[in-house]
């Protein structure tokens, strides 16, 4: 017979049989070799077919191995191994059966049919282990499903649904799906579409994370529980794995064959199977090559006729981008819009999921944590959607507590490290024999004994707490498994067994859980001394703070005191601007105490004043105060935005322009660091159109970038600086602050539009600096020089006369404090640099600076 008439799987099995014969030094390929090779190939399906026919497959494999060991061996046989006469006869019989059935190719199961009638060793073993001809023939008919084998890969296309889909209803039966809370309207609308005569294919469209896949899981749970109309009862809901369909399709037409096999299996089911395709937009263009059809086009006829009950899910953007472009595909689906749930609905969803997450992590999730997760995620995580972002917070906070439970508590870890340190020291001191060393050794021994006792006490408490926690955890898991069993019994209608579990075993387990939890409470004088086992609102706030950089968690006492004394801290670097410092400090205190308007930035200020009086310095100081670093200061020099088109640099270029994908400078910075100080320096130099962009930022705390994404500015402090009104401030230096402010505001109104000024929280006028202020600034500047000298192991002492001389040299009422820096460089740093290079000051020396004859003198 011709071997090219065998199917691909049969040819592979024959090749494997040849390898078996070679490995065993057998001169011929016997029927036993071929049958064992078929059983060893898990993908061939022969093992499953024989199991269906009632054959004990493991015992058969063991018998075949023994039979092969008894076959004659030929050492050093270098010739080609050929098919034995017995196997050739069996293959010819299989060929005859194939002709009778009208098959173009000989499939593996026909060899089994021939073998079941054979009287040789392999046939005898098959019968011995339960394989009679009638049962094997019945199993073959069931697997073939009345179809002919007309392609070499026909065996690979069998049971396509099993290979390329996952049964969601089966997972629901096993209790592996999360409970679906709410979403009744969307599920009802999907059922309504599924019951139509034609085009009965709903597609769920919504933003990422709103719960589209959860709706399908909810439908699977309702089908399992029988909470659906009669026409949907007992149906299967399968998830199509498109990646598995495409994976390994090497030749043209292979992907199409697989998809056709899936569609054929579905059509055989007479509408008893619903298919769910997640990310349905991937169908468009899937498997398309030159001249080939893509998956979307192959599905269209079945979708239109109503043969294929398909549920799709995709996001709004991808639906518009892929599905809407293909009008023929779009009309075959009915849209079901899935909106973002409200905060209240999200809280209900989280309460439903609470038990699953508690069992998974082995921690308790409190109700305040659930409320905090919904509210904080809605307020601070603006670029994602509920309920996904709230679930993420709960999951991460619980994961953090679980990680702490699995590792050694911090208090014990510190003691452990200290003990190791002392033991090393003891070994070193032990080698010394003098009296001082012996005294030190005695002290070390005493400390080690004391710390060891403390460590042992803590370890005992830790073990007790951990044991209590693990005990209650195992009971919770048992209760969860029991509830799944009860649901299954309820579906089967086994009321007697259900009553036994519900009124017998379940109350016992709940009583044990209550006992374990109450015992834990009594046994601990200080509850949770070492282990945190609860996720509270504070833990959720910590996760939000870590993810966004926004301080959401409760203020510690130290931070409260720091905020109350904020003016003093700012005055350490900003001299003589009391009104400005107070305005900024009040804005920060409002935000941290929770009184600030949540829909606006923390504060928006316009700083007006002459050059060099501390406008920019105050912003830098504020950033350092809030974040302990200047990195969170987003500084934009508005002199770079003098042209009309430069607005695009702030928010990103519009579609069609170069740089569209890159995003805007301001919007990208704020997206990465939502909690920051934004400094718009020299704001009057920008083009008037730039201010139009800032209007919505100042009013609503939001800005839409070039790509249509909304960027949240609600956690920023916006400061604009300008030199407008400098001349009036200089001229009216001695007048009252309010009089100066009115005069400056008159000039501001000529420069900026009323709607822009009206949106700014406070316009702050900075005073010009007098000689006393300059002297204070000189001290601050010299402090910086002292720090630089300290790195060189030098110290600096400057007399009051020398300081006055420097201040006088650096005082210029027009230019503010900037000339002072230049004066310090020229009068102090330059001569000092020469002296250091000349070797005048060795390490640990003190540089004395005094005033002599109107000049600075070094000693």
From Swiss-Prot:
Q: Name one GO biological process term.
A: cellular response to heat
A GO molecular function held by the record:
ATP binding
Give the region (Repeat 1) as residue ranges. Answer: 6-71
Positions with a binding annotation for ATP 2 = 609-616
Which residues does the record give as ATP 1 binding sites? 206-213
Residues annotated as domain Clp R: 3-146
Return the Pfam families for the record. Answer: AAA, AAA_2, AAA_lid_9, Clp_N, ClpB_D2-small
Supply the domain comment. The Clp repeat (R) domain probably functions as a substrate-discriminating domain, recruiting aggregated proteins to the ClpB hexamer and/or stabilizing bound proteins. The NBD2 domain is responsible for oligomerization, whereas the NBD1 domain stabilizes the hexamer probably in an ATP-dependent manner. The movement of the coiled-coil domain is essential for ClpB ability to rescue proteins from an aggregated state, probably by pulling apart large aggregated proteins, which are bound between the coiled-coils motifs of adjacent ClpB subunits in the functional hexamer.
State the name under which the record lists this protein.
Chaperone protein ClpB
Native source organism of the sequence: Chromobacterium violaceum (strain ATCC 12472 / DSM 30191 / JCM 1249 / CCUG 213 / NBRC 12614 / NCIMB 9131 / NCTC 9757 / MK)
